[in-house]
Amino acid sequence: METVFDYNQIKEIIPHRQPFLLIDRVVEYEEGQRCVAIKQVSGNEPFFQGHFPDYAVMPGVLITEALAQTGAVALLNSEQNKGKIALFAGIDKCRFKRQVTPGDTLTLEVEITKMRGPIGKGTAKATVDGQLACSCELTFAIQDV
């Protein structure tokens, strides 16, 4: 997959930084509508030190955060939203179907389905090798910093 935004370009769009920037690159992008990002899950991730030391599994809340960051890229790279922040305002219908472990390539896809003023909703899914790991509906609140 071709890179649309690399790691440094992502940091110009969303305010997240290490160790909490959870997407490595964007491979598909439609302004304000859709974004697909990739996270290479490494055994060196800090969360694996405690989740779990002898059985490394990426925490589900971090998978949903990675999805939220992917959605934030879709929303914040538009001219009207540059310099703003997208807050994670809600999550519905979240389901985890598969564990995500070191060595996995996590594909994160978010489609924005509704915008009403500064509030947006989207459908999201995370997959590994085409297998569904997580699906949910996200709510975003865009605001000035």
Swiss-Prot record:
GO cellular component: cytoplasm; membrane
Domain of life: Bacteria
InterPro entries cross-referenced by the UniProt entry: FabA_FabZ (IPR013114), FabZ (IPR010084), HotDog_dom_sf (IPR029069)
EC number: 4.2.1.59
Active-site residue numbers: H51
GO biological process: one example: lipid A biosynthetic process
Primary localization: cytoplasm
Subcellular location: Cytoplasm
Top-rank EC class of the record's enzyme: lyase
Annotated keywords: Cytoplasm, Lipid A biosynthesis, Lipid biosynthesis, Lipid metabolism, Lyase
GO molecular function, one term: (3R)-hydroxyacyl-[acyl-carrier-protein] dehydratase activity
Function, as annotated: Involved in unsaturated fatty acids biosynthesis. Catalyzes the dehydration of short chain beta-hydroxyacyl-ACPs and long chain saturated and unsaturated beta-hydroxyacyl-ACPs.
Entry's family note: Belongs to the thioester dehydratase family. FabZ subfamily.
Classification via PANTHER family: 3-HYDROXYACYL-[ACYL-CARRIER-PROTEIN] DEHYDRATASE (PTHR30272:SF1)
Name of the protein described by the UniProt record: 3-hydroxyacyl-[acyl-carrier-protein] dehydratase FabZ
Organism encoding this protein: Staphylococcus carnosus (strain TM300)
